[in-house]
Amino acid sequence: NPELKPETSKQWSIGTVFEPIDSLSMSFDLWNVQINDQVTAVSEGLIFNNPSKYADLFTTKHITSTGLDVLAVKLLPINIGKVENRGIDYDFTHKMKLLDGRLTTRLMGTYLLRSRYTTPGTNDQWETSLNRYGSNDKVSFRNIIRATSTYETAKFTHTLSASYRNGYT
């Protein structure tokens, strides 16, 4: 797409690490990312729901075997709008000696505070896909969590892990 412009972004974060004792660590990071001129392909549903807005993405394709021309859609990358995501990353780690080894337990994740984007083709109509299937054909999960427990000795290491993403509508 010759009209494609580069994405630009503004981002910030602030965080802290708290270690009240040698075996316990807690960290928190609040972050925000804003993207302008996001590059993505417009979904087929959006193209067909707004044919006048995306008329330049319609074309015809000749099928040689049938000799017919059919309607086709070009799924080209375009600058579609703005995106803003904000969340909190956290990590809790506990370490302890256990028998002949060391047990490390971690709980880490992201809690998404905001995930929104402008309706394609606009600069001021915001939508969200936070915990739901959005018009951008994506889901932004509010909670993404991973827990691990690792037992390590001089001879072996065993890790048990679990991952979680909350449901969506």
Sequence positions of predicted segments:
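Solvent-exposed loop/turn elements at secondary-structure boundaries
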Residues: 1-7, 12, 17, 23-34, ...
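Gram-negative outer-membrane beta-barrel transporters
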Residues: 31-168
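Short glycine/serine- and small hydrophobic-enriched flexible loop segments
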Residues: 18-19, 94
